[in-house]
Amino acid sequence: MANSIYNLAHADALPLESGNSILFPPLYDIVWSLIPFLIILIVFWKLVLPKFQEVLTEREDRIKGGIQRAEAAQAEAKAALEKYNAQLAEARTEAAEIREQARERGKQIEAELKDKANEESNRIIESGSKQLLAQREQVVNELRREMGQNSINLAEHLLGDQLSDNVKRSGTIDRFLADLDTVAPNGK
């Protein structure tokens, strides 16, 4: 280093005073540096850049494809959701209709059962009325027979006469019962 300083001190010109600049290299250095740079640039331009462009294009296509697939899946999911909502609304409507039909059918069954119960009640009442009328007729006939017999016995006892004649006996009984029939409706 001391030698360099000595050389600089004995030189005719200082380093900045000569035409060569420290910041700007000489022309031959620029030319010889430019040639390898151009060779490297051409190699990159012809070999590396197309491969790089191909990789970028492929990646861009994959990304676009992924986005398109995602959009398609999203559209499909949205369509499925709309379909599901439509089916759900349809099922709710159908359930409401079924409930309404069940209510109507229940009311109809209730009305039918009431009608059947009324018919059965009327039939039982009518049957009871018929039985009551039949029993009444039977009781009236038995009472007529007994009253007829009792009236004959009473008449024989009162008259002291025996009513042996069937025609006389039946005429007397019929008159007595006719008198009772005319008295009974008025006495009710």
From Swiss-Prot:
Coiled-coil boundaries: none
- The main location is membrane
Q: Give compartment(s).
A: Cell membrane
UniProt GO MF annotations: proton-transporting ATP synthase activity, rotational mechanism; proton-transporting ATPase activity, rotational mechanism
Q: Identify one Pfam family in the record.
A: ATP-synt_B
- GO cellular component: a single term: proton-transporting ATP synthase complex
Q: Where are the transmembrane segments?
A: 30-50
Q: Which UniProt keywords apply?
A: ATP synthesis, Cell membrane, CF(0), Hydrogen ion transport, Ion transport, Membrane, Transmembrane, Transmembrane helix, Transport
- Gene3D superfamilies for this protein: F1F0 ATP synthase subunit B, membrane domain (1.20.5.620)
Its topology with respect to the membrane?
A: Single-pass membrane protein
Q: Could you tell me which HAMAP family the record lists for this protein? A: ATP_synth_b_bprime
Q: What does this protein do?
A: F(1)F(0) ATP synthase produces ATP from ADP in the presence of a proton or sodium gradient. F-type ATPases consist of two structural domains, F(1) containing the extramembraneous catalytic core and F(0) containing the membrane proton channel, linked together by a central stalk and a peripheral stalk. During catalysis, ATP synthesis in the catalytic domain of F(1) is coupled via a rotary mechanism of the central stalk subunits to proton translocation. Component of the F(0) channel, it forms part of the peripheral stalk, linking F(1) to F(0).
This protein's assembly is summarised as: F-type ATPases have 2 components, F(1) - the catalytic core - and F(0) - the membrane proton channel. F(1) has five subunits: alpha(3), beta(3), gamma(1), delta(1), epsilon(1). F(0) has three main subunits: a(1), b(2) and c(10-14). The alpha and beta chains form an alternating ring which encloses part of the gamma chain. F(1) is attached to F(0) by a central stalk formed by the gamma and epsilon chains, while a peripheral stalk is formed by the delta and b chains.
Q: Which family does it belong to?
A: Belongs to the ATPase B chain family.
Name of the protein in question? ATP synthase subunit b
Instruction: Give the gene that encodes this protein.
Output: atpF
